[in-house]
Amino acid sequence: MKKPLILAFSVSMALLLCGCTSYCYEDTVSDMKIMYGSYFMFFLKYNPDGAAVSHYKWDGDPEKTDIIIPEKYGRQKIKCLGGYWGKGAPSPFFIDCSSYLDIKSDVDETVGSLTTSMDPSMVEPGTKVVYTDFTIHLSKYIEKIYARADATVYTVKGEKTAYCPRVSIICDEDNKTFYSKDGKLYYRQDDTLVDGFNYAP
């Protein structure tokens, strides 16, 4: 049975609102881990959207695939999945499996090394594909989403394996921007599907 992620979470690098004219980074947590994974958070100095979750780091445990997006970071509401770094560089939300695979590489030399991350549709023919299904729980505060479907490709003895996260989404019924149905996310305004996710079938 899957164990839900607790709302407590860790912050690795935060762009904080500070007095200087450039962006300031602060390393707030040394190990960057929580009970069931890690969130990377960032603030945008001139962005009224507020706090956002940049990406989710998966540690490889099949029981840790429920991703509960916290409602707040401190007093700041988390209104976005993904966003922009610095002065406007796009930073879409994605699920990062590479840390888990990098750990495997350190243990077993036959696993090989990371070669690339890409959209699952770009995986080369003949590549073995391994799917992992995640459930993302969105709060009522999420207003904007910049998401990226992602595949991490490893080469082992000349053979490529693509690790592809897939998602089902459960959105809070009180969210005024989005709603979920059958694991997919839609805009309330016009009932169109939110793209950028690799939805589970």
Report the location of each language-model feature.
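Positively charged n-region of N-terminal signal peptides that target proteins for export
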Residues: 1-4
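Solvent-exposed loop and capping/linker segments of extracellular ligand-binding repeat ectodomains
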Residues: 20-201
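Bacterial N-terminal signal peptides
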Residues: 8-16
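Short amphipathic alpha-helical "recognition" segments used for binding
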Residues: 6-7, 37
